[in-house]
């Protein structure tokens, strides 16, 4: 684009989209030099409640993802990716108006073209929408889906509570069977067991909406009689969403909560026997659980089974409230798809928070070193001179499908430094290429242990190296 046009375009950028500089702190911020960039330039910080996941964290994040994917493969879930932006109404209708997530925590944007949209605070509603939009009711039922991605909640940041965080989730749509509920609890349990740390499963049943309504009325009656003894928040909950009274952590409310009526007594025989079946399956699977009569999982879309996963090891921050340290949660949502405008489709799912899981994994790894596999390099590529650098990069690229793990640092010009790196990576062979080798179409293979070098044809190098490496596969190391 011609520069003049570009300049004109720049002029058109509405003021509100121009770079935001906090006014009060502008001077201070502009003077900051974080050792990067020029003096006088403002250094940007990651937004409050959000965090970068740096390469050094990879050793914790990678096993999470691999584990999630292996479980999905084994239990036959298909991967689904939904957009991070959705219509606001999708979450208002599914999660419910009176929930904290919808009332206070959504990042909402207004736009003439797309209307009121928000960053997704969770993915189950999106999966239900995609199930309908994608005509998945026509697939053989049930449809098993899994996702991995960032969620956004504009909450007050604190330990383990972020504004952008990752979740992995598993959903089963199109089957009403206690074995489905048990499978999802099993997946959550396995996810952590395979990572090497034990978790506690808390489980309850909240039955069907009509049973819950009767229970809510009873609970509200009970709390109304004790109104003068409960905390300010609970007084509000009593008016707005009595079920949330059971989430209260205030000391003054605990004795009242302990004596409160329990939802299980308001369940029909059919709901009770459904729940019993889920528990029987868990017994059969050897998944330990604790019945938690006050567990209701604040969202409107749940029916029957609800459960949460907690670390069984002390969490990163022992002072942290228990509700904040849940690693994951899930349950049955038989009415959601219909509520979203689809056909009646029984369903259930679980979502596990990865950021919190990583925190616990780190904490656990401090005491019990994890046997996380270290990458094993087969060869190291070293180069000397500009032309050799280009050829080395080309050869490294050509070897992508060779199955060999190749170490290199083409941006170091000293051969000595590069060979030291090769030593650090403990490779048995280094491939060295200089100007002379480029011209002659050859390459040097150096045995790192003996220091013996041989010159071979570049085209034959892959096969020769593979043959040499084979003796290590045969256990001759
Ligand atoms: P929920 O469905 O809200 O219970 O979320 C399921 C899991 O996602 C939780 O148990 C957490 O591990 C994780 N999670 C939820 N909200 C946050 C947050 N604000 N920051 C970090 N992780 C979260």
Task: Give the role of each language-model region.
Residues 2-477:
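TRNA-recognition modules of translation machinery and tRNA-sensing kinases, especially anticodon-binding
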């Amino acid at each position: 684009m011609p520069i003049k046009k570009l300049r004109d375009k720049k002029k058109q950028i509405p003021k509100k989209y121009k770079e935001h500089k906090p006014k009060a702190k502008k001077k201070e911020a502009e003077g900051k030099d974080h050792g990067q960039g020029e003096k006088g330039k403002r250094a940007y910080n990651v937004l409050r409640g959000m965090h970068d996941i740096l390469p050094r964290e990879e050793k914790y994040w990678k096993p999470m993802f691999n584990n999630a994917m292996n479980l999905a493969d084994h239990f036959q879930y298909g991967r689904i990716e939904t957009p991070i932006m959705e219509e606001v109404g999708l979450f208002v209708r599914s999660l419910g108006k009176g929930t904290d997530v919808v009332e206070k925590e959504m990042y909402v944007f207004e736009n003439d073209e797309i209307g009121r949209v928000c960053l997704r605070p969770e993915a189950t509603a999106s999966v239900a929408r995609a199930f309908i939009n994608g005509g998945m009711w026509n697939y053989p039922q049930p449809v098993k889906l899994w996702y991995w991605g960032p969620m956004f909640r504009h909450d007050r940041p604190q330990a383990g509570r972020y504004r952008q965080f990752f979740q992995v989730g598993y959903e089963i749509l199109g089957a009403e069977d206690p074995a489905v509920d048990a499978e999802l609890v099993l997946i959550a349990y396995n996810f952590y067991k395979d990572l090497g740390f034990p978790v506690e499963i808390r489980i309850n049943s909240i039955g069907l909406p009509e049973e819950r309504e009767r229970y809510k009325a009873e609970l509200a009656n009970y709390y109304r009689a004790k109104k003068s003894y409960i905390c300010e928040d609970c007084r509000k909950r009593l008016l707005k969403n009595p079920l949330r009274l059971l989430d209260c952590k205030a000391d003054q409310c605990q004795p009242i909560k302990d004596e409160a009526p329990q939802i299980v007594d308001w369940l029909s025989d059919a709901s009770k026997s459904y729940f019993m079946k889920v528990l029987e399956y868990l017994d059969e699977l050897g998944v330990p659980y604790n019945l938690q009569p006050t567990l209701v999982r604040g969202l409107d879309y749940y029916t029957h089974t609800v459960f949460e996963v907690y670390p069984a090891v002390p969490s990163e921050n022992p002072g942290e409230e228990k509700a904040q340290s849940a690693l994951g949660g899930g349950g049955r949502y038989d009415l959601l798809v219909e509520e979203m405008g689809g056909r009646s489709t029984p369903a259930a799912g679980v979502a596990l928070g990865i950021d919190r899981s990583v925190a616990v994994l780190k904490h656990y790894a401090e005491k019990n070193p994890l046997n996380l596999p270290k990458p094993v390099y087969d060869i190291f590529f070293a180069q000397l001179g500009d032309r050799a650098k280009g050829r080395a990069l080309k050869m490294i690229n050509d070897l992508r499908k060779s199955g060999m793990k190749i170490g290199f640092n083409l941006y170091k010009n000293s051969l000595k430094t590069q060979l030291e790196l090769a030593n650090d990576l403990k490779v048995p062979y280094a491939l060295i290429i200089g100007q002379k080798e480029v011209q002659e179409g050859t390459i040097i293979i150096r045995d790192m242990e003996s220091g013996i070098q041989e010159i071979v044809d570049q085209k034959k190098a892959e096969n020769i190296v593979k043959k040499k490496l084979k003796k290590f596969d045969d256990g001759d190391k």
